[in-house]
Amino acid sequence: MAKKQSILSPIIRITFTFLVLCGLVYPLIVTGIAQAVMKDNADGSLIYNDKNEVIGSTLIGQNFTDPRYFHGRVSSIEYKAEASGSNNYAPSNPDLEKRVEKSIEEWKKQNPSVPVTEVPIDLVTNSGSGLDPDISPKAASVQVERISKLTNIPKETLDQLIKDQTEGAALGLFGETRVNVLKLNLELQKIMK
């Protein structure tokens, strides 16, 4: 019996020690460093309106359906963050072809003056997560004519807005040149007021 206690005692102490270290100390240290070094990112990169209410995050896309605003990528989960993911069909899957054709038809209805051959692929295909907040600058630019027509904002103003909201690759290496749709639409909304 004494031998069992002598074996169990160090096991219990080690388990408790690692439980405290890995479950409490390490997360607190990492959270403290994140809050000190990159507070905005650690808090979810939230965007607030004039009333200091959270209206979104720069990291999660939103579904913009009003034709006066820029639209983001197609989302098979309708931008519901709790259901992140996508039907990642193989290029040979007929369902992918149907989904893309449906996206192109919707595009043509809203943007009849833009030839389908000029529509960037990111506007008619899903992302892996279904939550992409960004589109390519070209994807934003092909929407300028529609938005200009509906809002009476000059195309040049919209082009400059896109240019101002365009972000380069992170550290000059990671990712693509992109435009955050939520931030772009918030700036557009300021012009429309």
From Swiss-Prot:
- Primary subcellular site in the record, as a coarse category: membrane
Location(s) in or outside the cell:
Cell membrane
Q: Which InterPro entries match?
A: KdpC
UniProtKB keywords: ATP-binding, Cell membrane, Ion transport, Membrane, Nucleotide-binding, Potassium, Potassium transport, Transmembrane, Transmembrane helix, Transport
The record lists the membrane-crossing segments as: 14-34
Q: Name one GO molecular function term.
A: ATP binding
The way this protein sits in the membrane is described as: Single-pass membrane protein
Q: Report any Pfam family annotated for this entry.
A: KdpC
The record's Gene Ontology cellular component field reads: plasma membrane
Family assignment? Belongs to the KdpC family.
How is the quaternary structure described? Answer: The system is composed of three essential subunits: KdpA, KdpB and KdpC.
Q: Which NCBIfam families match?
A: kdpC, PRK00315.1, PRK13997.1
- Give the protein's biological function: Part of the high-affinity ATP-driven potassium transport (or Kdp) system, which catalyzes the hydrolysis of ATP coupled with the electrogenic transport of potassium into the cytoplasm. This subunit acts as a catalytic chaperone that increases the ATP-binding affinity of the ATP-hydrolyzing subunit KdpB by the formation of a transient KdpB/KdpC/ATP ternary complex.
> What name does this protein carry?
Potassium-transporting ATPase KdpC subunit
Q: What organism, scientifically named, is this protein from?
A: Bacillus cereus (strain AH820)
Q: What are the leading ranks of the lineage?
A: Bacteria, Bacillati, Bacillota, Bacilli, Bacillales
